[in-house]
């Protein structure tokens, strides 16, 4: 497909995504067809989509800047740092939390295949194979009842687990840990860009993270051209509100036990 076709699809998807987020973009929809013949026109339309205001009838409070997020938090929740546990107790809990997330990834990974099912579908497959309630990793019999299987099933089903198979839920936690180990709490977006380029294969990330990593790589090819990493997340990135932001946050909670406000600030950054 031509670059104009690809860009046109991205801008159309971006417009629809911003509509779902409550932005007033309907007046821009007729411009899609007019802009389709020019990459410059599509890029200009994308900028207008980004700058569109929130609809006046949007019923949700969803601030974008950190201080507004903090101001919208439940005022009854503690934000200041406190130490109620010893270093040894904290270490044990953080280790347990991380290893539990690894085990959970292994447990769910064989089932992560379209069409995606919910708890009732999982229950039905487990009951059909005589394995409900679940007390172990997914078996071949349960996958057969499920009717589809993730390609990783050969390394994540019962009797085949020899290591933790690569998974983005685990990878982003490790990336966050490495970032803090290497750069401390004052890390920058540039530090994160460099870390991702050095450690994160593009095929092991999805959606908006893949888009950002692709742009990070392209920036390396043209170091003399300016770039705005803040813009990467919110422009020409129609999957920007997929679940990646949630699975990237764990490491900052682990790194700031007893200090939820600092953890939130690091995760926001």
Language model segments and positions:
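Structured, active/binding-site neighborhoods that engage oxygen-rich ligands
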Residues: 1-269
């Amino acid at each position: 497909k031509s670059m104009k076709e690809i860009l046109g699809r991205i801008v159309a998807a971006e417009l629809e995504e911003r509509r779902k987020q409550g932005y007033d973009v309907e007046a821009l929809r007729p411009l899609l067809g007019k802009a389709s013949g020019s990459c410059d026109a599509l890029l200009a339309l994308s900028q207008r989509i980004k700058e569109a205001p929130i609809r006046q009838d949007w019923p949700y409070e969803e601030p974008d800047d950190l201080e507004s997020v903090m101001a919208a938090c439940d005022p009854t929740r503690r934000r200041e740092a406190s130490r109620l546990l010893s270093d040894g107790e904290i270490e044990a809990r953080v280790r347990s939390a991380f290893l539990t997330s690894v085990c959970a990834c292994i447990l769910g990974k064989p089932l992560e295949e379209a069409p995606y099912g919910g708890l009732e579908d999982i229950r039905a497959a487990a009951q059909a194979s005589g394995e409900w309630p679940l007390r172990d990793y997914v078996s071949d019999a349960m996958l057969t009842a499920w009717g589809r299987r993730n390609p990783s099933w050969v390394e994540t089903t019962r009797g085949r687990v020899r290591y933790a198979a690569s998974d983005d839920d685990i990878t982003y936690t490790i990336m966050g840990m490495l970032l803090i180990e290497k750069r401390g709490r004052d890390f920058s977006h540039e530090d994160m860009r460099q870390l991702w380029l050095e450690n994160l294969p593009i095929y092991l990330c999805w959606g908006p993270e893949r888009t950002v990593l692709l742009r990070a790589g392209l920036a390396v090819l043209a170091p003399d051209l300016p770039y705005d990493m803040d813009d990467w997340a919110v422009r020409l990135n129609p999957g920007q509100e997929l679940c990646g932001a949630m699975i990237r946050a764990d490491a900052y909670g682990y790194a700031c036990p007893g200090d939820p406000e600092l953890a939130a600030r690091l995760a926001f950054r």
